[in-house]
């Protein structure tokens, strides 16, 4: 992998442009490819909407074609809310995040990924199923997980086996693992096991973010995945990234300035208005630039919500390595953890002092006889 960029803060325009050109995102593969004329098919699921279709497409990637049907294809007597309408989506591995120049040393190159939930510990040989069949079932499962997230409902292994991948129990670890990976990389949704005995799971936004970009209706799709991608790029660039670098990454995902996307809407609005208003990003003119050039920085909400160690673990997981493989960022993440711990201690001390003062004041007060 290319060497990691130097961790420099916001620099003069000339230096920043030079660094951006040498770093780039060479070799990155697009995690999303959008096709406007996606076809639809019928799902075999019995307990989630018929508009969650199976895909007949074959892929060797880790995330699969998701081809929701149009609302008109859902039967009128189906009382379950329709899932969102979207174009065909394909997620290839490695993703843009996985292709970022993260390598800072040769150490830790053989590090293993973090352990998965107990349900996923043993993955069967995928050769026992055709790749196209795996793709189809993972697609069904991702659609099911998205619906459950939209409905804010937990899920169980038994429910998945009954509703989505019936007759595939032996392959549940493989299918569930790949569907969970797709949920994380594309939509920024973590599938967390909350009961190892009963194999029950909840779906939550990754990295502790309190934003998913969804509207009030169930037609909306979570946008946390693309937000994490942008914040990751800004992080490894030193919290200050030229606008051109961001658009380069988005273009590889099939997102273009001024072109409406069926899931994300108009990308420029998302970047420069929605996320700026949500305080996840700052968008400003590069000082002294003429003609004007712009750059992105982390906003106050990103700094408040995202632990750098969590983000580094996310990037390491995507790259199949260990956070210690990136000593420069790991050192910064440790510093962030220490600062947060000190803030918690200070807050606790202040609360204790206030409670003590209040108690003393109450105890010294006496009623007149």
Swiss-Prot record:
Keywords: Nucleus, Tumor antigen
Region of interest (Disordered), residue spans: 1-131, 340-369
GO cellular component: cytosol; nucleoplasm; nucleus
SMART domains linked to this entry: MAGE, MAGE_N
Domain MAGE: 134-333
Tissue specificity of this protein: Expressed in many tumors of several types, such as melanoma, head and neck squamous cell carcinoma, lung carcinoma and breast carcinoma, but not in normal tissues except for spermatogonia, spermatocytes and placenta.
Cited InterPro entries: MAGE, MAGE_N, MAGE_WH1, MAGE_WH2, MHD_dom
Membrane-crossing segments per the record: none
Polar residues compositional bias, start-end: 85-96, 107-121
Alphabetized PROSITE patterns for the sequence: MAGE
GO MF term (any one): histone deacetylase binding
Compartments, as annotated in UniProt: Nucleus
Keyword Nucleus among record annotations: yes
Pfam family, one: MAGE
Skewed-composition ranges (Low complexity): 39-62, 348-369
Lineage: superkingdom: Eukaryota
An annotated GO BP: negative regulation of transcription by RNA polymerase II
Main location: nucleus
Role noted for this protein: Not known, though may play a role in embryonal development and tumor transformation or aspects of tumor progression.
Protein name listed in UniProt: Melanoma-associated antigen 10
Source organism of this protein record: Homo sapiens (Human)
Classification lineage: Eukaryota, Metazoa, Chordata, Craniata, Vertebrata
Gene symbol of the encoding locus: MAGEA10
């Amino acid at each position: 992998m290319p060497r990691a960029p130097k961790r420099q803060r916001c620099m003069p325009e000339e230096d920043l442009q030079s660094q951006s050109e040498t770093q780039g995102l060479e070799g990155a593969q697009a995690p999303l490819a959008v096709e406007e004329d996606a076809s639809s098919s019928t799902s075999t699921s019995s307990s989630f909407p018929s508009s969650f279709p199976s895909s007949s497409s074959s892929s060797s990637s880790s995330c699969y074609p998701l081809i929701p049907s149009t609302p008109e294809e859902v039967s009128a007597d189906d009382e379950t809310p329709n899932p969102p309408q979207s174009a065909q989506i394909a997620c290839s591995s490695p993703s843009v995040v996985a292709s970022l120049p993260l390598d800072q040393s040769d150490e830790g190159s053989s590090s293993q990924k973090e352990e998965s939930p107990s349900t996923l510990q043993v993955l069967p040989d995928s050769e026992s199923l055709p790749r196209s069949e795996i793709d189809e079932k993972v697609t069904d499962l991702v659609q099911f997980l998205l619906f459950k997230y939209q409905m804010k409902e937990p899920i169980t292994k038994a429910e998945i086996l009954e509703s989505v991948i019936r007759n595939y129990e032996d392959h549940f670890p493989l299918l569930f693992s790949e569907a969970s990976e797709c949920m994380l990389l594309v939509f920024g949704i973590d599938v967390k096991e909350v009961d190892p005995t009963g194999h029950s799971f909840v779906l939550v936004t990754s990295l502790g973010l309190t934003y998913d970009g969804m509207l009030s209706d169930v037609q909306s799709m979570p946008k946390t995945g693309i937000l994490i991608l942008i914040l990751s790029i800004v992080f490894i660039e030193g919290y200050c990234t030229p606008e051109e670098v961001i658009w380069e990454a988005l273009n590889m995902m099939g997102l273009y300035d001024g072109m409406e996307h069926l899931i994300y809407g108009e990308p420029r609005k998302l970047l420069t208005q929605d996320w700026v208003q949500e305080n996840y990003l700052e968008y400003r003119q590069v000082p002294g630039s003429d003609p004007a050039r712009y750059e992105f920085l982390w906003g106050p909400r990103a700094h408040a919500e995202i632990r750098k160690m969590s983000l580094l673990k996310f990037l390491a997981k995507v790259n199949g390595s260990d956070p210690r493989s990136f000593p420069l960022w790991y050192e910064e993440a440790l510093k962030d953890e220490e600062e947060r711990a000190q803030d918690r201690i200070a807050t606790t001390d202040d609360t204790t002092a206030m409670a003590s003062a209040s108690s003393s004041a109450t105890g010294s007060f006496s009623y007149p006889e």
